[in-house]
Amino acid sequence: MGFYEGDDNDANTKAFNDKYIKDQKFATAPFWNLFPKLRDIDEYDNPLLPLPFNFNFRDLGDSALAMASGIPTVKQFDKCEELKGQSAWTTQGIWKCLVPSKAIPPLPQLDFLLPLEEIKSDKSHSHGLFFNDFNLFLKWRSHMNRLQKQRIKTRSTAVEPLARTPEDLMLNWDDLHLGNDAEYASADGSKKIVGRAQSISTTKDSNDAKPSTVKTEKIYFDDGTVDITTTTTSKGSSPQVKHKVVSVDEDN
């Protein structure tokens, strides 16, 4: 079913969580935490927000208040009760009302209303993961936070042993961000990048007054291979580029 039941080892839930981290770059807090908790308002109230300009939160749409606070307005909840719906939350902590089929058709065109049976029968979570208890949502967020930290640590560890000194090797941590796997892959898509490293050094031949700069770029793949490109430049000469692919064990 489309509901989270507290079992993170469930095959469908694990598959959803893994894809969610990769595709959406899971954050440690939902974006609506940036907003203050809003009191219940009716259509004539103006929410008081600490903004330096006149702002009406209702202008953002029918579910804006639910997005900001994780709870529905009284008006939204009354509509949900009228339709015999049940409360649920999305992975972003946004409140939704899941309405049984007996209220359909017609289902009012309100963006906080969703068909209950369609969500319950969604075993593969193609419509997303839903929580019928806010405590379960918080439990899932906590699990995902730990999972992301574990993934980052695992990938960082795979690169760290290859470093010589901070001066010799500069890790490009932007490319290690969790969730970028789909972007960083080999041309044929057969393997994924798990890390990058770069080093720049300057050498000077005793017989030549012209110094040379050697830039080495390494790309680490999930199959244990390393793509190495070395570019040597010196003043007055064309850059010399060498490229090779070796195993991690052969990389030195």
Swiss-Prot record:
The keyword Lyase does not apply. Keywords: Membrane, Mitochondrion. Pfam families: MPM1. Transmembrane segments: none annotated. It is found in: Mitochondrion membrane. Its main location: mitochondrion. Residues 230-252 are annotated as: Disordered. It is a peripheral membrane protein. One of its GO terms (cellular component) is mitochondrion. Present with 3390 molecules/cell in log phase SD medium. This is Mitochondrial peculiar membrane protein 1. It comes from Saccharomyces cerevisiae (strain ATCC 204508 / S288c). The gene is MPM1.
